[in-house]
Amino acid sequence: MDFETIGLEGKYKELIGAPSAGFSCMVYGKPKSGKSTMCIDFAKHLAEHHGNVLYAAIEEGYGYTMKEKLERLKATHKNLYISENIPHKLSKFDFVFIDSVSKGKVDNNQLNELIKSNPKTAFIFIFHSTKEGDFRGGQENAHDVDCIIEVKEGVAFGKGRFGIGGEMGVF
């Protein structure tokens, strides 16, 4: 039996494998580890090659530092939309990044409802981590997603259901 994937290639396929439409992913790490930088670059890649992307910059907002990151990463594409919140209607997006779940005060039930209500949309949830390096939130968050990316000191480590767990430099 064959299953259709989104056709992910390059460094992101090496990091998380070959996800299908509607996948979900958790990204976590300590402050200033490179989470947002990696996710903006991933959003850019998805917008350039795979469809419409919403990047909900709840934590940082659309201010000078976000504008600087977008310019530095050359993350300007007609399919990449930046918002300071999560719009009620997400049907026009193939991929939605929520940066961050912690700052947006989105609980696990709300995350599951987003996924359930938008089955063809992939969600990438960004979480803060504790001083010990574990992600904030209940363990159910990790069980409910298809892949997990830990960003640690500028290096992203992926693992999940798509057969590959790799690593890549962020900075």
Question: Where are the regions a protein language model picked out?
Answer:
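Conserved P-loop
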Residues: 20-84
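Short, well-ordered alpha-helix to beta-strand connector turns
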Residues: 22, 50, 92-94, 120, ...
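Phosphate-binding/switch region of NTP-binding enzymes
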Residues: 116-171
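Alpha-helical scaffold elements adjacent to nucleotide-binding pockets in ATP/GTP-utilizing enzyme cores
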Residues: 65-69, 113, 140-144
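N-terminal pre-Walker A segment at the start of P-loop NTPase domains
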Residues: 1-14
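Phosphate-binding/switch loop-helix module in NTP-utilizing enzymes
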Residues: 77-126
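Short acidic, S/G/P-rich loop/turn micro-motifs used as interaction or catalytic elements
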Residues: 31-33, 61-62, 101-107, 130-133
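Structural recognition of alpha->loop->beta junctions
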Residues: 15-16, 74-80, 141-152
